[in-house]
Amino acid sequence: MKSFQKSYEFDYPWEKVTTANWMKYPNKISTHVIAVDVLRRELKEHGDVLLTERLITIRQNTPHWMSILVGNTNLAYVREVSTVDRRDRSLTMRSCNMTFPHILKCYETVRYVPHPKNPSNVTLFKQDAKFLSGVPTKTFSEKVENWGVKRFSDNAVKGKVGFDSILAMFNDIWKNANE
């Protein structure tokens, strides 16, 4: 099993980051995400918790050696379940790939919370992903997991840049609304 962790600070209040999160994809930078469909959304805990289940469609090429295992497909699907908790001001998203889980399973958790030192203006982002290959041979299994981490890392960079652009766009809207 391989893992990937990343954390950032966004110079926006948690409420704004959480709002912008729903518009994060698709964007011009993260072109691998081609669709995000809401499957279910409901309020829990007397309206304090918003539960959302989404299907994320991704299109990207796989290396030739991987096509031996998965065929010539370039589409993948990810199930994401998120909770927004107004009481503790947290957004937690958990996702897992639905495509080819017998070859590579990716479990991701993302969490947005107010920064403890500046909770009114800064939001902490923490991302943790685990990669587990189901390929029976150790050498090939490690190659699959390493490829998964590398691809995920590359996409995470694009995701951060893309989300920064979404936040900047929303910031302009928020500023204009307050004028």
UniProtKB/Swiss-Prot annotation:
UniProt-recorded name of the protein: Protein UPS3, mitochondrial
Family assignment from sequence similarity: Belongs to the slowmo family.
Function recorded in the entry: Required for mitochondrial morphology. With UPS1 and UPS2, controls phospholipid metabolism in the mitochondrial intermembrane space.
GO cellular component terms, semicolon-separated: mitochondrial inner membrane; mitochondrial intermembrane space; mitochondrion
Gene Ontology MF, one: phosphatidic acid transfer activity
Topology in the lipid bilayer: Peripheral membrane protein
Start and end residues of each PRELI/MSF1 domain: 1-175
Protein keywords: Membrane, Mitochondrion, Mitochondrion inner membrane
GO biological process: mitochondrion organization; phospholipid transport
Annotated localization: Mitochondrion inner membrane; Mitochondrion intermembrane space
Major location category of this protein: mitochondrion
Subunit and partners: Interacts with MDM35.
Membrane among keywords: yes
Pfam families (UniProt xref): PRELI
Further remarks about this protein from its record: Present with 672 molecules/cell in log phase SD medium.
Keyword Repeat: no
